[in-house]
UniProtKB/Swiss-Prot annotation:
The lineage of its organism: Eukaryota, Metazoa, Chordata, Craniata, Vertebrata. It is a multi-pass membrane protein. It comes from Mus musculus. This is Sterol regulatory element-binding protein 2. Residues 83-93 have a biased composition (Polar residues). GO terms for biological process: cellular response to low-density lipoprotein particle stimulus; cellular response to starvation; cholesterol homeostasis; cholesterol metabolic process; negative regulation of cholesterol efflux; positive regulation of cholesterol biosynthetic process; positive regulation of cholesterol storage; positive regulation of miRNA transcription. Residues 492-522 are lumenal. The chain crosses the membrane at residues 471-491, 523-543.
């Protein structure tokens, strides 16, 4: 035995050990069971090789001379036998009688690649036999090779000597064959694929050797046994079938029939050949041959062999290679390839997982695909039914049709549940779940009979009427009341009676005129009867239209489940931004409720006309009271009437919310543009049904529906139906209550006069794709009220800043006193804006059950930040240092949405606020830090002027830019005046440095550039140009001319439009007076007392404006001039 052979054997056994440890037989059985169950559903994906059955059979043959022993035909295989060698130990046997000893025999075995060997189980079967004699013959067995790997010779001598002992080898599929006493040397040729490479030669004096294999042949030896050399060459077979036959001495061919689970039948012709290998032969000439079997060192009870027999050395550990090992290796290799392919399909090529995990994932994935397929089939079925009923059967309630058809489909579907459902991958899976869902997900409520109640069929009143039938009934009623055929019938009846009895009256007749004695009673009774009949007819029509004609859907019924499925799907589509899919689901909801949208102009005209009539009738309290009484009497018991009334109100509420959401999508432009009549129709439907729902709908939702209707009429109909928009707006305000207690915070701005004025002036627009704004957070794109609220917040911010940078108009043309100062107006606007901004996040979706639809997730932090920044600037201008410090903590926290935009205007405002805060610091470096922040803000402001044309809200951008530029120039002026005042105390003259002048000139250049596109900036240019000349110490003549431009008063009559924007305001005039009185020489003033008069006027103006810092400086200058108290009092 060479070393390479031993190393190869060891490597092969290690590979098989690793494969056995990684994949268990339980996983393989589970996968095979699952694949076999899927053959019916996926015939193209699975083959039926492992599922096919093989017929079984066996044949027994033998001689008639010797019938002392027969083998048992094992047609069926015991499952306990089909196990590995490690699980089935070999039973021991005990000798029953002593036998003569024989010399040891050696057997040469030619092994093949290793495979798992069949199960060996020796059983003691004592059978007395006559004494045997030994002869020597030679038998050569030469089977055909199909695949022949490299052959290795392994010496494995095993000798068993027993007088009366039968040795039995058990394997599946037993078959017996009885030989004749006379056996001649033959040659066995057989077409197989694999033959085990080990044989056992057993020498017995008088005994029987039985061999049971998958294709097992039982051989009964004759009394005379002779030793014949047998040469067996192994072959490669696909299964563990083995063939054993005996040799007859007469030379006749013997046919051995073999049955195997993988092969139908094998037939081996037996021929004689030259004797080459010695075997055991009985005394009467019978040749005994055995099947090749594997008996490992740890499987054979060698210790029970009689002591007289010489035992050879045990085989080495690396020599356990059998044909079954080869079969098992190929079997596992095939399984491994398929499992790797499954892993690549399910989890990808890069995933790493054990084979059992791959099988579980594959089973779960197939279950998931089945679940999705089932859901898609059900949704497709419902959508097809709804589409078909919309086109063909508009006058029939779709709910009942969906109910019956869905029941039929579900019954058909439930019959195939077990066929379509694969076996559970986890033994702990609960059976209560739907067979189409994975283990952790409950089944669909549409197929779960426990969740959907079997409600009785709705009564005829729940079917409803189409709008064409309603209009037709109204027209017939109107025509009947107009022509009044009952009056003609009564008159015809009275005339007929008069003709029959012309002179039978009780009164007198003068010139053929009869004077009846009945009086007023004769004509009053027919009139009362006529009005009574007409009233009954009209009331019946109202009951038919408003009570019996309304479709009602029972809760927990099949149509109700379908409605809620599509309603929730519409919520998810709206949250994801898929507005087309949401609109389709909402239309399906309306179809299920029996309120399909009109598809033709005739249907649209009838629906619109009926909704106008219905809205008019609902405003009549008498009609509502009569309908309520009739409705209560129509039901048998009060409890039944109350229950049906609740169901009717719930159905009306659901339909109203669906109409309202569709109307919002049409207004915001998320759907293809339709006609104005279609929008008015949806608005009226939502309003009518919401009012019918009464207490079932929230007051805030009812207010929102009326406001949306007003917006739709305002945007789509324009000035034609503007009065209707005002009516619905007033109606919404009346629903809020006298003290606006029921109005939600998100709609409170419409109750304010400024909000109403803004809404009615239509200075807003609803866009389908709202642009991102720097001044407000993004609102819900499908909510028109949120978009109008966003526009109103920006309008308030613009008004607040405009009151600071633009002059205020006078109350009257002849009134010399101007309005209140810009600071108070700006603060009032900012206060309103702050209150309206905080209430943005409390608005809910009309579908209150959905938590994913919100107009905003909280207050508008962006608009709040701008409010805090402008308020801080006003506080700094007023000289309120405490308010500046408190507001700076809010301004310092810039929202992330503004940081992401990287807007230079936002950075300019932020650094300006930091500069104002640093200027209040009492430290030595406070002014230097303020100057550095001013430089950074100046650079960002210049950048914003270059990109301002490409941003949204251009008017608001110009106002903010002008305000920021004015703040920077005012801050630079304040810093210069502080340094100049400190120098004057020391008796020195202070002139600004070149860096300060360069920064001031850069901001002044930004102001001039802004004035070219925004005219109100001119009112600031002259004042700041005069300031920079004073800082540089330039000639005072030109400086005085520039200041005169701000000091001069101008008449308001005969002024062109736009010139008022360039005039300086009150604060600019007071600031110019302070600069002139402080820095200009006295010779530039007209009279010696003019300076004190101008300072007194400036002090009154600054006090009125609220600029406490500048007013204090003015008072100090008046005191220095002397006599300032008397001048101020005058």
């Amino acid at each position: 035995m060479d070393e390479s052979s031993e190393l190869g054997v060891l490597e092969t056994m290690e590979t098989l050990t690793e494969l056995g440890d990684e994949l268990t037989l339980g996983d393989i059985d589970e996968m095979l069971q699952f694949v076999s169950n899927q053959v019916g559903e996926f015939p193209d994906l699975f083959s039926e090789q492992l599922c096919s059955s093989f017929p079984g059979g066996g044949s027994n043959g033998g001689s008639g001379n010797n019938s002392s022993g027969r083998g048992n035909n094992g047609g069926a295989t015991d499952p306990a036998v089909q196990r590995s060698f490690s699980q089935v130990p070999l039973s021991t046997f005990s000798p029953s009688a002593a036998s003569p000893q024989a010399p040891a025999l050696q057997v040469k075995v030619s092994p093949t690649p290793p495979r798992a060997t069949p199960v060996l189980q020796p059983r003691p079967q004592p059978q007395p036999q006559p004494p045997a004699q030994l002869q020597q013959q030679t038998v050569m067995i030469t089977p055909t090779f199909s695949t022949a790997p490299q052959t290795r010779i392994i010496q494995q001598p095993l000798i068993y000597q027993n007088a009366a002992t039968s040795f039995q080898v058990l394997q599946p599929q037993v078959q017996s064959l009885v030989t004749s006493p006379q056996v001649q040397p033959v040659t066995i040729q057989q077409q197989v694929q694999t033959v085990q490479a080990q044989r056992v030669l057993t020498q017995t004096a008088n005994g029987t050797l039985q061999t049971l294999a998958p294709a097992t042949v039982q051989t009964v030896a004759a009394p005379q046994v002779q030793q014949v050399p047998v040469l067996v060459q192994p072959q490669i077979i696909k299964t563990d079938s083995l063939v054993l036959t005996t040799l007859k001495t007469d030379g006749s061919p013997v046919m051995a029939a073999v049955q195997n689970p993988a092969l139908t039948a094998l037939t081996a012709p037996i021929q004689t050949a030259a004797l080459q290998v010695p075997t055991l032969v009985g005394s009467n000439g019978t040749i005994l041959t055995t099947m090749p079997v594997m008996m490992g060192q740890e499987k054979v009870p060698i210790k029970q062999v009689p002591g007289g027999v010489k035992q050879l050395d045990p085989p080495k550990e690396g020599e356990r290679r059998t044909t079954h090992n080869i079969i098992e290796k190929r079997y596992r290799s095939s399984i491994n390839d398929k499992i790797i392919e499954l892993k690549d399909l399910v989890m990808g090529t890069d995933a790493k997982m054990h084979k059992s995990g791959v099988l579980r994932k594959a089973i779960d994935y197939i279950k998931y695909l089945q679940q999705v397929n089932h859901k898609l089939r059900q949704e497709n079925m419902v959508l097809k039914l709804a589409n078909q009923k919309n086109k063909l059967l508009k006058g029939i309630d779709l709910g009942s049709l969906v109910d019956s058809d869905v029941d039929l489909k579900i019954d058909d579907f439930n019959q195939n549940v077990l066929l379509m459902s694969p076996p559970a991958s986890d033994s702990g899976s609960q059976a209560g779940f739907s067979p189409y869902s994975i283990d952790s997900e409950p089944g669909s409520p549409l197929l779960d009979d426990a969740k959907v109640k079997d409600e009785p069929d709705s009564p005829p009143v729940a079917l409803g009427m189409v709008d064409r039938s309603r209009i037709l009934l109204c027209v017939l009623t109107f025509l009947g009341l107009s022509f009044n055929p009952l009056t003609s019938l009564l008159q015809w009846g009275g005339a007929h009676n008069t003709d029959q009895h012309p002179y039978s009256g009780s009164g007198r007749s003068v010139l053929s005129l009869e004077s009846g004695a009945g009086g007023w009673f004769d004509w009053m009774v027919p009139t009362l009867l006529l009005w009574l009949v007409n009233g009954v007819i009209v009331l019946s029509v109202f009951v038919k239209l408003l009570v019996h004609g309304e479709p009602v859907i029972r809760p927990h019924s099949r149509p109700s489940v379908t409605f809620w499925r599509h309603r929730k799907q519409a919520d998810l589509d709206l949250a994801k931004g898929d507005f087309a899919a949401a609109a389709a689901n909402l239309q399906t909801c309306l179809s299920v409720l029996g309120r399909a949208l009109p598809t033709s102009r005739l249907d649209l005209a009838c629906s619109l006309s009926w909704n106008v009539i219905r809205y008019s009738l609902q405003k009549l309290r008498l009609v509502r009271w009569l309908l309520k009484k009739v409705f209560q009497r129509w039901r048998a018991t009060p409890a039944t009437a109350a229950g049906f009334e609740d169901e009717a109100k719930s159905s009306a509420r659901d339909a109203a919310l669906a109409y309202h959401r569709l109307h919002q999508l049409h207004i915001t432009g998320k759907l293809p543009a339709g006609s104005a009549c279609s929008d008015v129709h949806m608005a009226l439907c939502a309003v009518n049904l919401a009012e019918c729902a009464e207490e079932k709908i929230l007051p805030s939702t009812l207010i929102e529906i009326h406001l949306t209707a007003a917006m739709g009429l305002k945007t789509r109909c324009g000035g034609k139906l503007g009065f209707l928009a005002s009516y619905f707006l007033n109606r919404a305000q009346s629903l809020c209550g006298p003290e606006h207690s029921t109005v939600p915070d998100s709609l409170r701005w419409l109750c304010h006069p400024l909000g109403q004025k803004f809404f009615m002036e239509r200075s807003w627009s609803i866009k389908s794709a709202a642009k991102e704004s720097l001044y407000c957070a993004q609102r819900s794109p499908a909510d028109p009220i949120a978009q109008v609220h966003q526009a109103f917040c920006k309008n308030l911010l613009e008004r607040a800043v405009e009151s600071l940078v633009k002059p205020q108009a006078k109350k009257k043309a002849g009134d010399q006193e101007e309005e209140s100062c810009e600071f108070s107006s700006a603060l009032e606007y900012l206060k309103l804006l702050h209150s309206f901004v905080d209430s943005v996040g409390f608005v809910t979706s009309p579908f209150s059950s959905s938590s994913v639809l919100r107009s905003a997730l909280g207050p508008d932090v962006i608009c709040r930040w701008w409010t805090s920044a402008v308020t801080m600037a006003i506080s700094w201008l007023q000289g309120d240092d405490a308010a500046v410090r408190s507001r700076f903590t809010e301004v310092e926290r810039v929202p992330k949405a503004l940081e992401v935009t990287e807007s230079p205007l936002v950075k300019a405002v932020f650094y300006t606020c930091r500069a104002m805060h640093a200027s209040l610091s009492g430290k030595a470096d406070g002014q230097q830090n303020s100057f550095c922040h001013c430089e950074r803000a100046s650079g960002h402001l210049w950048s914003s002027l270059n990109v301002s044309g490409t941003t949204s809200d251009p008017s608001l951008n110009h106002v903010i830019q002008l305000f920021t530029c004015d703040l920077l120039l005012s801050l630079r002026t304040a810093l210069w005046q502080k340094q100049a005042s400190a120098s004057q105390l020391l008796g020195e003259t202070y002139h600004a440095s070149g860096t300060e002048l360069a920064g001031f000139q850069r901001d002044l250049g930004s102001l001039r550039r802004l004035a070219h596109s925004f005219r109100p900036a001119y009112r600031k240019v002259f004042l700041h140009e005069a300031t920079v000349r004073l800082m540089a110490g330039a000639s005072p003549t030109r400086t005085h001319q520039l200041l005169e431009h701000s000091l001069r008063r101008r008449p308001t009559q005969n002024t062109k439009h736009g010139e008022v924007d360039t005039w300086p305001g009150q604060r600019e005039r007071a600031t110019a007076i302070l600069l002139a009185c402080r820095h200009l020489p006295l010779s530039f003033l007209s009279s010696p007392g003019q300076r004190a008069v101008l300072l007194a006027e400036a002090a009154r103006t600054l006090e009125k404006v609220g600029d406490r810092r500048s007013c204090s400086d003015c008072q100090q200058m008046i005191v220095k001039l002397g006599g300032g108290t008397a001048i101020a009092a005058s």
